[in-house]
Amino acid sequence: MSTAVAEFKPSEKLLKTRNIGISAHIDSGKTTLTERILFYTNRIHAIHEVRGKDGVGAKMDSMDLERERGITIQSAATYCQWKNHTINIIDTPGHVDFTVEVERSLRVLDSAILVLCGVAGVQSQSITVDRQMRRYNVPRVAFINKLDRTGANPFRVIEQLKEKLKHNAVPVQIPIGLENDLKGVVDLVTMKAYYFEGKDGMDIQEKEIPDDLKELANKKHEELLDAASMFSDELTEALLEGTPTEEMIKKAIRTGTIELKITPVFMGSAFKNKGVQKLLDGVLDYLASPVDVKNKALDQNNNEEMIVLESNYEKPLVCLAFKLEDGRYGQLTYVRVYQGKLSKGMTIYNMSNNKKHNVGRLCRMHSDEMEDIDSAEAGDIIALFGIDCASGDTFTDGKLKVSMESMFVPAPVISLTIEAKESKHLNNLAKALNRFTKEDPTFQTHVDPESGQTIIKGMGELHLEVYIERMKREYGVELITGAPQVAYRETITSKADFDYTHKKQTGGQGQFGRVAGYMEPIPLEETLDYDFVNKVVGGAIPREYIQSVDKGFKSCLERGSLIGFPIIGVRCVINDGAYHDVDSSDMAFQIAGRYAFRQGFNKANPQILEPIMKVEVDGPSEFQGAILGSLNQRRGMILNTTEEDAYCKTEAEVPLADMFGYSTVLRSSTQGKAEFSMEFSRYAPVPRNVAEELMKKYKVNNKDED
């Protein structure tokens, strides 16, 4: 099959390429689905379950840690071929702590499959993933999985897709049977029934629609035609004449899908080998090729003017490094080629630092195995060796000076002090931290200048736990960890004036600078951490020292006076000042700015803010009381509770400070039957008693400074 693809001329090859992601809530079965796709496309020759008895683990979960936990942590890239098309698949993590992996893979994809559980339906992480897909305008089809499970109801899930995710969700199939009776699907375009029989569901039987499903199939077929005809005049006319063809229907659905105005819904059970091949057909029929997607870049020579890239191999090269891994053979850089051609031996330039690199080896990846290739063209996803770069860097062949727009990276909400148990491991610890921070922009590290301790920051407890475990396993570093720390912030609540004169005379040239003005709170909805406004007139502060004042202000933002955390939401306006011809300098105005800021900050009724997390708990209804109680004890504000089929879903907002250790509490109070997910929602003021406690603790720890 691969030779057939190689013979196409590039434009044809591009039309027959699909770059897709498979995204979902944790435990919706997406790694199992990927495993089946690889099996049916002959990329693997045996099926292994995620938590299988054979101990092999799914193909895409290549890290030992993933096989043990049964969750996917890193996006593994792989490719396969189906009906003369090349499909590049990025398998993305479903746990909310790893959303940067999802963000990063969606950035380089052309379309995606949103996997939903036929029982649980749209869950919190489905909403997060969907929001990420919207941010990057990713067209998608939905696959309602696990229809073999007790309580499965695909039509309820479609309603949730419409209500919760606001999708124009239209089924292109209906199931033949449900739960233990799931046998296959009815295709609402061809109006035929398909049964998946034989070992591993390889034997697909096409038959007439069963009598008991004809009425429902006809009704859903009409609904599908109505929805599809909105995107095709040709189909509308054909419907009036009573002559619509399968081709017309598919073309109309494809147009609506790529325009993000319709979401075709497929059904089945990956675990029971039902419906996967028809979903693959849907990927070819309805999802975008690289030609269908507009990719933009910023022109560095023209004020970062937005330009549109062309999926054309004859144009100058533009590609994006979207993932880094330390493999057995050195750093592996996953790259998406957006324009032009990338070949072995070529010189490429990193736009973030203008460094040039020679391309030594190009590979196509299959989870953690690789296949050498000589070149890659627009639309390809491949891996490079030995290129030193960071995730999100743009490479060109030097003919263009452009960069892809930077990816949205959320700020970390939790930190932890770490130290190596044995000093002989310090070198390995430094190596591990250097690698992980390069691979994952939401995993950050720094050394506290006062305590000398190494601090790691991330998106949640599990996120940091996984990195601690990886340091032990991959680098042999045993760590001593401190208690988790919440990323508090400080801000002001009222307007306050400042007027500070810095004067210092120590023989020779002195220092002089006066800074006056006011600071005021920036409303939270403006999502601006700091704003500097210059209203000085008449040269009270010379122009060259205005930046010095700004620098002085900025140096105060790193550490507030209440509990030593960063300051956000402050607008500083300078409107007066004074200078001295001889004694004024950049440093004098920086120092004046620093003291003026502190003066204003302490008068502006400062307060402490804490991260509030959106928490969603799913569990059996019999434990609803225990779940509500556990959230109330944690200063939780219940937003919504819904009950369906003996299951309850509770949505709440809870301060991160009170969520540590929650998974253990939830497990023990619900016999391990409930699960929760959380993500950052916003910053909010801490209650007075908590603020007093934090300030008292800060004073005790910093009494030496007073």
Curated annotation (Swiss-Prot):
Q: Give the top-rank taxon of the lineage listed in the UniProt record for this protein.
A: Bacteria
Keyword flag Secreted:
no
The molecular function terms in GO held by this entry are: GTP binding; GTPase activity; translation elongation factor activity
Q: Which UniProt keywords apply?
A: Cytoplasm, Elongation factor, GTP-binding, Nucleotide-binding, Protein biosynthesis
Please list the residue ranges annotated as the tr-type G domain. Answer: 15-291
Checking InterPro entries in the record gives: EFG_II, EFG_III, EFG_III/V, EFG_IV, EFG_V-like, EFTu-like_2, G_TR_CS, P-loop_NTPase
GO CC annotation terms, alphabetical: cytoplasm
Q: Which residues bind GTP?
A: 24-31, 91-95, 145-148
Record's subcellular location: Cytoplasm
Q: Which family does it belong to?
A: Belongs to the TRAFAC class translation factor GTPase superfamily. Classic translation factor GTPase family. EF-G/EF-2 subfamily.
Q: HAMAP family attached here?
A: EF_G_EF_2_B (MF_00054_B)
State its role. Answer: Catalyzes the GTP-dependent ribosomal translocation step during translation elongation. During this step, the ribosome changes from the pre-translocational (PRE) to the post-translocational (POST) state as the newly formed A-site-bound peptidyl-tRNA and P-site-bound deacylated tRNA move to the P and E sites, respectively. Catalyzes the coordinated movement of the two tRNA molecules, the mRNA and conformational changes in the ribosome.
UniProt name for this protein:
Elongation factor G
Q: What is the lineage of its organism?
A: Bacteria, Pseudomonadati, Spirochaetota, Spirochaetia, Leptospirales
State which gene encodes it. fusA
